[in-house]
UniProtKB/Swiss-Prot annotation:
Residues 1-551 are lumenal. The active site is at D125, D372. InterPro entries: Aspartic_peptidase_A1, Aspartic_peptidase_AS, PEPTIDASE_A1, Peptidase_aspartic_dom_sf, Plasmepsin_5, TAXi_N. Residues 58-83, 289-323 are annotated as: Disordered. Belongs to the peptidase A1 family. The gene is PMV. This is Plasmepsin V.
Length: 597
């Protein structure tokens, strides 16, 4: 009987112990979570205070810089008289571009928004006009390189509020805010509201900073490609339409009258550079001037779009020879072959031919094409694409051990091709060299060809104004994908031909807004790996402490499970000790005499 009450009493005590333990653990958990949250808030406040201090320092520096602007502008006016002969690097503002065609599918730069500033990564897009990015409070935005822009952190931000129909520039009033809405040809759409703030461009080569106020779009909804891109926003570089929101590039040159209204883009396989105020002659390939003269002489002797002087195929040692020559390049603007921009607000130019092995495969007399750094690939009409693809397919050999297939290609004659080539022998030589060097080719999605090497692949030649033929090398119209080089051409969409990034690559594309013209100069563009990009306080850190991202209910359950596990172990241990004390083994009740008998 006594044992029974003892057992009951112990289990009651044990139950109380379990209850108190669970209550204690749960409260400790909540307290710890609150402490973590408070620490995060304190860190955020400290960062905000540091940002404000930085902003005050920047304002002081701006005042000092503004005092020197008058003196510098006077010097600029004197220097501008000699700028027609030479572009001085000190007068240029250079900005590093990051990204590539394969992994990112775009190139982007970093600019500062607000006072104190918050860094935002923006895709460089000459095919659009808006400057926009996600803002704090957006529930339909993706995870990008930086956290959404926080308007409350900036002392200079101002939302563009409205009352039914008083929005400027013909904008719509939605929810007492002027609506921002942008649609793109690939199907992406973003919308939100407009706000104004200070835009600052920190140049890596020039201590002076370009800064001005700009009306920008705050994303409250993203979809399609924008939802999954790594860069935070978009920076449009096209021109202002009548009665439209003033664009970035127009405001930039309006607030820096000392600069020439010229900018250039130079991208390599990884990264590149944006140059404001001119272009960089030092990047020109050393034999560029010789090439232009040679091409002009070739064009003067051409007939009906076919070049009479033999255009060589891309050779393995071309780049080595170009770099080894020590030829002085003239910096005179007159040596650059300019192309007129054919439309008012976007960068369209006319092309008059596209040559492959000396044969013009374009069936139209001319074609308007958009020069667009926001498009990854170059989009051409379907008939031109099919012609190029036909010849590249012949040069694409999947299995070097398939003797039947190889012999079949080697037996091709010029008459058996869809369109005879002017330099058919060069085509056959390239095919033989590809086979001999085992330049294997594979096909990826949508039949896109990829070669292991650029060797013996053909150059393309684009005919521009004044019958000037510009070389388009495989290192440009193909892009690096792991250990292969893949075709960067696609069929046009919505009847809109585009010269995309695969045309920009390894060229300095110069936009002269004063003369309304564009030039393409083969250049050795700088490389900037994304891994070398400076870090910032407002970046999105993917490797944060995982426990800070777990919800409180999940964290509570985790602690509860741990507590129950510990308590269960204690119960089993106490139970074992209890039975050992109150229920001794039968052998323990026997006397020593009984055991001996």
């Amino acid at each position: 009987m006594n044992n029974y009450f003892l057992r009951k009493e112990n289990f009651f005590i044990l139950f109380c112990f379990v209850f108190v333990s669970i209550f204690f653990v749960s409260n400790v958990t909540i307290i710890k979570c609150n402490n973590v949250e408070n620490k995060i808030d304190n860190v955020g406040k400290k960062i905000e205070n540091v940002g404000k201090k930085i902003g005050d320092m920047e304002n002081k520096n701006d005042n000092v810089e503004n005092k020197n602007d008058n003196v510098e502008n006077k010097n600029d006016n004197v220097g501008n008289k000699n700028d027609n002969v030479k572009n001085a690097s000190s007068d240029l503002y250079k900005y590093k571009l990051y990204g590539d065609i394969d992994e990112y599918a775009y190139y982007f730069l970093d600019i500062d928004i607000g006072k104190p500033s918050q860094r935002i990564s923006l895709i460089l897009d000459t095919g659009s006009s808006s400057l926009s990015f996600p803002c704090n409070g957006c529930k339909d935005c993706g995870i990008h390189m930086e956290k959404p822009y926080n308007l409350n952190y900036s002392k200079t931000s101002s939302i563009l509020y409205c009352n039914k129909s008083n929005c400027p520039y013909g904008l719509k009033c939605v929810g007492n805010k002027c609506e921002y809405l942008q649609s793109y040809c690939e199907g992406s759409q973003i919308y939100g509201f407009y706000f104004s703030d200070i835009v600052t461009l920190p140049s890596y080569n020039n201590k002076k900073k370009i800064s001005f106020e700009k009306l920008m779009g705050c994303h409250m909804h993203e979809e399609s490609l924008f939802l999954h891109q790594q860069a935070t926003g978009v920076l449009g570089f096209s021109l202002t339409k009548p009665n439209g929101v003033p664009t970035f590039v127009d405001l930039l040159f309006k607030h820096t009258p000392s600069l020439k209204p010229i900018y250039s883009i130079c991208v390599s396989e990884h990264g590149g550079e944006l140059i404001i105020g001119g272009y960089e002659p030092d990047y020109f390939l050393s034999n560029q001037k010789e090439k232009q003269k040679m091409d002009k002489s070739d064009n003067n002797s051409s007939n009906k779009g076919n070049v009479s002087i033999k255009l060589k195929n891309n050779d393995k040692n071309d780049d080595e020879e170009n770099n080894s020559k020590d030829v002085i390049v003239s910096n005179n603007v007159e040596d650059i072959v300019w192309q007129a921009i054919t439309r008012k607000y976007y960068y369209y130019i006319k092309i008059y031919g596209l040559d492959l092995y000396g044969t013009n495969i374009m069936d139209k007399k001319e074609l308007d094409m958009l020069v667009d750094s926001g498009s990854t690939f170059t989009h051409i009409p379907e008939n031109i694409y099919n012609q190029i693809n036909y010849y590249l397919d012949i040069l694409c050999i999947h299995d070097m051990t398939n003797i039947y297939e190889i012999n079949k290609r080697l037996k091709l004659t010029n008459e058996s091709l869809n369109k005879p080539l002017v330099y058919f022998e060069d085509f056959k030589t390239a095919l033989k060299n590809i086979i001999q060097n085992e330049n294997l080719c594979i096909k990826i999605v949508d039949g896109v060809q990829c070669w292991k090497s650029l060797e013996n692949l053909p150059n393309l030649y684009i005919t521009l104004s004044n019958n000037y033929k510009m070389i388009w090398k495989p290192s440009s119209y193909l892009y690096k994908k792991e250990s292969f080089w893949c075709k960067g051409l696609e069929k046009q969409v919505n009847n809109k031909p585009i010269l995309g990034l695969t045309f920009f690559k390894n060229k300095q594309v110069i936009f002269d807004l004063q003369q309304n013209q564009i030039a393409f100069i083969e250049s050795k563009c700088p490389s900037n790996l994304t891994s070398s990009r400076p870090r910032t306080f407002n970046e999105y850190r993917e490797k944060e402490n995982i426990f800070l991202k777990v919800s409180y209910i999940n964290l509570y359950c985790l602690w509860l499970l741990l507590a129950l596990t510990i308590l269960l172990s204690l119960i089993l241990y106490v139970r074992k000790m209890f039975y050992m004390d109150y229920f001794p083994l039968s052998d323990q009740n026997k006397s020593p005499i009984q055991e001996s008998t």
